[in-house]
């Protein structure tokens, strides 16, 4: 009964944990690394074709984004997640594949002129579509059994529509251990979705620490702030441009604007228009509306029961096609434009910035975190000019930020979550935080609450039955010199072939004991395949 820590160790992104228990091999989360990497991540120590299943906490790419990649390498097992997470992953993984293929096409056009080797995306649309078929929707609070001796319960983590903490109970050799994976723990009193559900019993806890060293402070009045920005901008004849993450944050903005319109907080501008210019955001909003009763909080449900859609209001316009998007720029009325991506590094928001950033009447309102190195970060730090589509654009618009808005619990919320466990767990593993933050939070858990805690590096292996560390890895810093080049398309195809060969061997090993006539037919199929491809001209 072992756990190996793969990703989001001393880093925020790339969540992935590999478990061997009750004769099964499986993952909890399979996330993509995003932003700068500081430490090398251990590869999953098994051929993906040998994995039995995956448990998924939620749909964000840093938790789900590598699922198509392991599918491409042979993983064909079920992926258990809440129903809302299954629906969001359907659109988000396809969107991720589209972005990667588009980026590869762009880089290869540029690279061919410079004689550079071909850039290959991590996975294709075919891989994304394939893995989506393997999702198994699970209700909150109901125990499921993905394999004998393994039971799983999803409880609401309050971070994103469908997000969950996972309670995993394993029975092996007459012993039972309960492991809780926090997933991303939500901030209290977020609009629309419920607060996180506390758990009370676990032998081991793997918990996030994104804000493990800081408090969000007093909650601002978001509706008042947004009303003031819109009123002030419209009064001078401008428009409000909101770069926003398509899933989660966009729906929160719609929730706030519905209230602003209902309470007539913006005066003198009639039924002003609000454009949501993001196909992904529009699809996500539809999914939010499909999961009102299982995911919405009491305030949102109260609106629904009155026949009010919390995400709809007069003046709301959605744009799907590129022509729809371009047409917005010809609308000279004062308006609000909500568009992705939230950090302004991709998507239709860049076109809206090109058309609106120069005009001092307009306001660019940031409603989410802006990572170092992004266009959004440059704007909030006071850039006077920026490059957009090869052109220099002067920053004349007012740049504003909505303070304190976060989908993650702060340090106080994290402490309250872990304190809810009645008996102290044997061990708490602190992950999903910046390098120093994981160590700071682990020490705080030990010093203030008396918990046995550690912040493991990628590659650390822990024996859950013996409560002992089998191997404690050390962080290996990434340097530019050690960064491996992207494999060529031919190399990637060969790697996939090798992966399929390894999966075939796995199936062969599992076939021992089946009827002889089936074994004989299986052998003939393999013989025929070998005869077809074992040629001198290959």
Where are these regions (language model features)?
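His/Asp/Glu-rich metal-coordinating catalytic cores
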Residues: 1-55, 64, 71-252, 256-273
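Charged, amphipathic alpha-helical linkers/stalks
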Residues: 459-518
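Hard-cation-handling environments
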Residues: 229-374, 386-387, 437-439, 444-447, ...
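A polyampholytic, Gly/Pro-enriched intrinsically disordered region
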Residues: 100-105, 292-306, 387, 470-492
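Short secondary-structure boundary/capping segments
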Residues: 94-99, 103-107, 221-223, 256-261, ...
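Generic long, charged, amphipathic alpha-helical segments
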Residues: 387-418
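C-terminal, active-site-flanking charged/polar segments
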Residues: 359, 434-479
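Short, surface-exposed amphipathic charged segments that create phosphate/polyanion-binding patches used
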Residues: 150-154, 287-295, 415-416, 465-477
């Amino acid at each position: 009964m072992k756990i190996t820590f793969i990703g989001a160790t001393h880093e925020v992104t790339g969540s992935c944990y590999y478990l061997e228990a009750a004769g099964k091999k499986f993952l909890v989360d399979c996330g993509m690394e995003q932003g700068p990497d500081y430490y090398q991540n251990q590869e999953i120590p098994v051929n993906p074709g040998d994995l039995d299943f995956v448990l998924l906490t939620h749909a964000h790419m840093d938790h789900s984004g590598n699922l198509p990649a392991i599918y491409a390498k042979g993983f064909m097992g079920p992926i258990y997640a809440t129903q809302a997470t299954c629906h969001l992953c359907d659109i988000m993984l396809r969107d991720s594949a589209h972005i990667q293929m588009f980026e590869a096409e762009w880089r290869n056009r540029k690279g061919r002129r410079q004689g550079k080797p071909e850039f290959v995306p991590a996975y294709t649309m075919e891989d994304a579509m394939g893995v989506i078929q393997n999702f198994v929707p699970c209700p909150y609070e109901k125990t499921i059994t993905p394999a004998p001796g393994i039971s799983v319960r999803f409880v609401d983590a309050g971070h994103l529509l469908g997000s969950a903490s996972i309670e995993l109970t394993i029975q092996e050799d007459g012993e039972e251990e309960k492991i809780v994976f926090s997933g991303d723990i939500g901030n209290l009193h977020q609009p629309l979705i419920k607060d996180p559900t506390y758990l009370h019993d676990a032998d081991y806890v793997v918990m996030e620490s994104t804000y493990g060293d800081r408090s969000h402070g007093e909650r601002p009045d978001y509706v008042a702030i947004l009303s003031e920005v819109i009123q002030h901008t419209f009064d001078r004849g401008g428009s409000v441009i909101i770069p926003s993450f398509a899933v989660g944050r966009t729906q929160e903005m719609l929730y706030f604007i519905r209230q602003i319109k209902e309470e007539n907080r913006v005066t003198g501008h009639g039924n002003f228009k609000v454009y949501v210019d993001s196909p992904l955001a529009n699809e996500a909003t539809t999914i939010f509306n499909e999961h009102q009763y299982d995911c919405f909080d009491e305030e949102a449900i109260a609106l629904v029961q009155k026949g009010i859609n919390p995400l709809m209001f007069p003046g709301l316009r959605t744009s799907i096609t590129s022509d729809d998007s371009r047409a917005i720029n010809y609308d000279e009325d004062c308006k609000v434009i909500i568009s992705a991506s939230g950090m302004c590094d991709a998507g239709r928001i860049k076109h809206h910035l090109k058309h609106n950033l120069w005009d001092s009447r307009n306001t660019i309102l940031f409603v989410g975190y802006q990572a170092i190195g992004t266009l959004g970060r440059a704007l909030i730090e006071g850039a006077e000019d920026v490059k957009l589509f090869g052109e220099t654009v002067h920053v004349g618009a007012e740049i504003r930020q909505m303070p304190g808005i976060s989908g993650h619990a702060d340090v106080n919320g994290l402490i309250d979550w872990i304190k809810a466990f009645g008996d102290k767990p044997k061990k708490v593993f602190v992950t999903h935080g910046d390098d120093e933050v994981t160590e700071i939070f682990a020490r705080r858990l030990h010093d203030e609450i008396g918990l046995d805690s550690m912040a493991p590096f990628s590659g650390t292996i822990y024996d859950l039955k013996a409560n002992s560390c089998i191997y404690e890895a050390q962080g290996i810093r990434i340097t530019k010199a050690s960064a491996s080049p992207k494999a060529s398309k031919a190399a990637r195809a060969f790697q996939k072939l090798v992966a399929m060969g390894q999966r075939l061997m796995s199936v062969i090993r599992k076939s021992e004991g089946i009827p002889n006539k089936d074994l004989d037919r299986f052998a003939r199929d393999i013989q025929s395949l070998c005869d077809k491809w074992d040629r001198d001209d290959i």
